Amino acid sequence: MTSTIPTPPSIPFLGHVASIEREVPLRSFRLLSEQYGEIYELNILGRKLLVVSSAKLMSDVSDDKNFYKNMSGPLLQVRNAVGDGLFTAYGEEPNWGIAHRLLMPAFGTASIRDMFPDMLDLASQLVLKWERFGPKHRIDPAEDFTRLTLDTIALCAMSYRLNSFYRDSSHPFVQSMVDFLVECNLRANRPGLLTSVMVQTNAKYEEDIKTMTELADEIIAERRRNPTDKKDLLNIMLYSKDPKTGQSLSDVNIRNNLLTFLIAGHEPTSGLLTFALYYLIKNPEAMRKAHEEVDEVLGDQQIQLTDIGKLKYIDAILRETMRLSPTAPMRTVRPFEDITIGDGKYFVPKDYTVVINTIVAQRDPTVWGEDSNEFHPERMLDGKFEALPPNAWQPFGFGMRACIGRPFAWQEAIIALAVLLQKFDFVLDDPSYELELKQSLTIKPAHFYVHALPREGKPQLLATPSAAPFSSHARETTNASLPASPGTEAKQPMYVLYGSNTGTSESFAQRIANGAAARGFRATLGTLDSVADHLPTDGPIVIVCASFEGEPADNAAHFVERLTSLQDKPLQNLRFAVFGCGHHDWFRTYQRIPKLIDQTLEDRGAQRLVPRGEGDAGSSEFFEAFEAWETKLWEVLPEEYNTVVKQDITSGLKVETVGEGATRAVDLRQHDAALGTVIENRVLTAPGAPQKRHIEFELPEGVTSRAGDYLAILPSNPPQDVHRVLARFGMLPEQQIVISSSGPSSLPTGRQISAFDLLSGYVELSQPATARDVRTLLNVESSDATKESLKALLESYSDAVLGRRLSILDLLEQYPDIKLLFAAYLALLPSMRTRQYSISSSPLWNAQRVTLTVSVLEAPALSGRKEPFLGVASTYLANLRPGDKVQMAVRASNAAFHLPQDPRTPLVLFAAGSGLAPMRGFLQERALQKKAGREVGRAVLFFGCRSPDEDYLYSDSDLKEWEELGVVELRPAFSRALEKSEGCKYVQDRVWHDRRALDGLYEAGAKWFVCGSGKVARGVKEVLTAMIKESRGYSDEEAAAAFERATVGRFATDIFE
């Protein structure tokens, strides 16, 4: 008996049109697959179809005996230009058989090998272009690969040179083709009646077809005017006869097929190369192996035809790229007769449209493993590719209607990738870039830009002093390498580099860069990845970085991989200093990356300027540790480099007031931030309880998320604090000022900005004053009594300043006779940083929206002020109203802190307070999957809060519904209502009480997630260790070791303070 095929809720007459994203429909199909599983049914304006998304079902419908290629949707619209060309012809059309038989030999092995010189010629033109533009040039790989592949198909198949690399802009054919394919996609999902009245759109559509057709006609006319004996594809179409029927192709069909090859012969290959470059840059180990293979096979010699077969790893890179991102991500078939698929589980009627969701099916964990979403070319090597189940890898389609030009595209791609890797290293223009898609008939990366750095002395990490190691984007986003103010002398270069996910290391790096000018240095600020391939040697390198569960920050991964791959001592001309940030709760990996960088630099010949510094974010002396290290650094650097130190703390920063004004600047200072919109903001807790809020946002266009990811928010300071500063310095909120700086600065330099906007959005006002800040105030003119008080504060800094969280502003208000200038005050303040909050929703609920579950910090001021202390970001969020715009960015959490791909995997969740956020997202996803008919694994949630009446978040809504649905078992711990939680006060108490309920979950493959404070995480670890000790009869040491072994890859934490 067959099973019912699930279908999403629909709208009368429209069906599921509203469920499909307009710009990138593929994202919607992927999310529907995650929710409904391997098969689901859609109704698009009355056109019904089945979507299959598993390797098994993809294989079942890849059967020429029982299924035929379906010409519908966007592909049907493409026929408006290419008619019965090979790609779009119906199987029963005579011209398809004639063209297929005629042209198959043209793509045989011998013919493709003969095209090698022309392919190399054009790949060399691309290399030459990137060499001449140099490493500072921002490259759009998709655009240049389109030039390459279009020119290649035209030259190799038609002996026609388009000379795209000698044009300032793309060939007119390209833009017309792109617009045409986009409109084909839109027409497929638009009512025909609506299309018929879109006069301007239709006129543009016809004009695009005309532009493409004119090029095809010109190529044919050129060949007829100048015949050749070359047996290229064009000559075969013009002069050959079908061996079976004796017929020739008609002039119309020749044009149709010429257009087909111009479109299909270049668009997928340019996408393949663009995706491959993206995956290599994002996976430094794969990039290193690719360079090693190219160096071993090619050396410094030009690639030869015989080299192609030796480039096994390059071949694996392309295969893995096409697995993860097949440029034709979906195809459709129909059965000749009624049939069942999935071992008889699903019934498919005759001629019913079946959409093969290739991009999802090729990530099926049953074939590719739990890491199927990750890029690992090794899975295509050593016989693994050949051992795959039938039809598991199908980026070129299947059977008789598979891509005829696959051998052509593959040879072209191997040549191009090999010669580019032989010549260049590549870095992202925006180090934080994550893959975005643009979709027409095919897909490509969107907004993807890189820099090509010439490889010298392979493997090379050093650059000459004159080299420009930083990408232009890095300079934009960090204000690095700002020119000195007029009249300032040239200074000794220094390079301040950071690896930071949360912004702390970046903030410390910015502080060092801010202080450089006063010490005679011209600082350049950038990410570690921005110098991954070329470290400058004409000045000191100062590194501030962190570890994230033992791994480098996102903008330092490439640097770490490149550094650790060096051999011998190539860094003897380099001088460096390293400060590491970390948190002692991650004791196994504490300071791992800072230690690794520091030691490896020394091992490879670099000279350490000062001992590595350590800052523990879990310690009350975190900022003091950095300050002590920074003080030592500034003692050493001027002496080592013979620079002049100025005593004026305002050196390098000037503030000019320019009169009143009303214009407020909007400055997106986080490179990946864009504007989202507040949809809802409501309180979750009872009156009198510490406030927690549920906030819903509309994401910026094109931004996607996963359950477990973070939403980074760029906040503003509480208005009460801003007004305190204005009052202290006697300024009006509307006062317009202009800032100039002789060094890199995160402040808005060189333009007018109001004092209120500056203080609201660019600096941190409430961070505790550092000991250095207090010493600075001590050196400013004030009364003797004030100086004595400041000295006393310094002597007991930890208790008197840090313990009371006294900010610079608090001190200035407490001692009003300190004559500190406003510019000097700004120079002391750290730059505003983003705050990351765990997303508390799943994209299966709404792909365009996310929710946050936030604790609002409002507590008595430890400084003694009457007004309460307000958390900067939480106060900002609490005061948002629907419709407000917010600067935000989705940032991936640790790879382990995501749901397992198989929804049947059990979950054990531990959370307290707003730490429930990611768990809510996980459970929401599981609930939606279960409602869609999928089998989901058991989930147990241990949640800590005060009481069921005060702050048991979502207990009367989502959690109640999901418990009733059978998605989750709720096991709360109420710290102020123990009688309502089995006498358990904290999460770990409830875990111990209910420990028998967890029997068998580990053996069933459960994943364990913790989100909350360090105290919560430690408590959970201790109780789980105690459970191991009890069940196994282990000693404390044995139980602790067993916990460490058992949790590898199965236990993920997200700790916040």
From Swiss-Prot:
Residues 671-900 form the FAD-binding FR-type domain. GO terms for cellular component: cytosol. The keyword ATP-binding does not apply. CDD domains: bifunctional_CYPOR, CYP120A1. Its cofactor is FAD; FMN; heme. One of its GO terms (molecular function) is flavin adenine dinucleotide binding. Residues 494-634 form the Flavodoxin-like domain. FMN binds at residues 500-504, 578-610. In the N-terminal section; belongs to the cytochrome P450 family. Self-sufficient cytochrome P450 monooxygenase that catalyzes the regioselective in-chain hydroxylation of fatty alcohols (C9-15) as well as fatty acids (C9-15) at the omega-1 to omega-7 or omega-1 to omega-6 positions, respectively. Is also able to convert naphthalene to 1-naphthol and 1-naphthol further to 1,3-dihydroxynaphthalene. This is Self-sufficient cytochrome P450 monooxygenase CYP505E3. It comes from Phanerodontia chrysosporium.
